[in-house]
From Swiss-Prot:
It is an enzyme of class 2 (transferase). It comes from Thermococcus kodakarensis (strain ATCC BAA-918 / JCM 12380 / KOD1) (Pyrococcus kodakaraensis (strain KOD1)). This is Ribose-phosphate pyrophosphokinase. The gene is prs. The keyword Transmembrane does not apply. D-ribose 5-phosphate binds at R185, D209, S213, T214, G215, G216, T217.
Length: 280
């Protein structure tokens, strides 16, 4: 059965409509600001679901409290699904004295949970920091199906070579061609982009990445595709970690911006619930 933390409540209606069993939990705040959780119901196994978007630290502490409460109730096997995993980009030391933040969080969660599932984690290598079983879940199928009719016989592009595997996964769902943008610095302040080995003229194009934050790269890529004669331009990502004004900037530059609902946003039109149901 599922237990939904405060970062997973937006999945509840769809999960219930699919017939999933959901364990009741009370989550509130003490007058001094500390978090209170109480698990209602009993069982042997539970799958806790909660994204750790803002306020990230609060949601991480909540997951620890939920894990402790479930153990106290006698649950023997606990899975944790964190669709968006905070601190995933803090995966290395760049200055002396810094922590590897993603490692610290994973080790703490590993005290209570045997299995961890993350959707499209920024760096899959960090999964080794979790003491138990850790899995990177691909949203390629749900993203691909959402854009199937819109793209037709178009193509899928990654904004850079590092995201090429993501574009390949979505393209394989659709049976389409895929490639990536190559960046070349032509001055200290200017970077040139171009798609590698594909002709976009007259085609519908989907640009896909793991995270959109400021949206600057997506806007520049879309502007270039317009100049190259692309027909319709779509942008998607697993996680919409949008900085202020980013949704508006990207939306103005493309025909549609649609991300998954690992984080609830106004453009979270692609549901990961079909993938969540496989993890119960």
């Amino acid at each position: 059965m599922f237990l939904l933390g405060s970062g997973g409540k937006h999945f509840e209606d769809e999960l219930r409509n699919a017939g999933a069993k959901i364990l009741e939990v009370e989550i509130k705040r003490f007058p001094d600001g500390e978090k209170y959780v109480r698990v209602m119901g009993n069982g042997d196994e539970a799958t806790v679901v909660s994204s750790t978007f803002y306020p990230q630290d609060e949601k991480i502490v909540e997951l620890l409290l939920l894990g402790d409460a479930l153990r106290e109730k006698g649950f023997e096997k606990l899975k944790l699904v964190v669709p968006y995993f905070a601190y995933s980009r803090q995966d290395r030391v760049t200055k002396d004295g810094e922590p590897i933040s993603v490692r610290a969080v994973m080790r703490a969660l590993g005290i209570y949970y045997e299995e961890l599932y993350i959707f499209d984690t920024h760096n899959p290598e960090t999964l080794r920091f979790f003491p138990g079983k850790a899995v990177n879940v691909s949203p390629a199928r749900v993203i691909g199906e959402y854009f199937r009719e819109k793209l037709g016989d178009g193509l899928v592009l990654a904004p850079d070579k590092g995201a090429l595997e993501r574009a390949r996964a979505v393209a394989e769902v659709l049976g389409l061609e895929y490639s990536h943008f190559e960046k070349r610095r032509i001055s200290p302040t200017e970077v040139e982009m171009h798609p590698v080995d594909v002709d976009v003229k007259g085609k519908n194009v989907l640009i896909v990445d793991d995270i959109i934050s400021t949206g600057g790269t997506m806007v520049r890529a879309a502007e270039l595709l317009r100049k190259l004669g692309a027909k319709k331009i779509y942008v998607s990502a697993t996680h919409g970690v949008f900085a202020e004004g980013a949704i508006e900037r990207v939306s103005r530059a493309v025909d549609e911006l649609a991300v998954t609902n690992t984080i609830p946003t106004p453009v979270s039109r692609i549901s990961i619930v079909p993938e969540l149901l496989k993890l119960e």
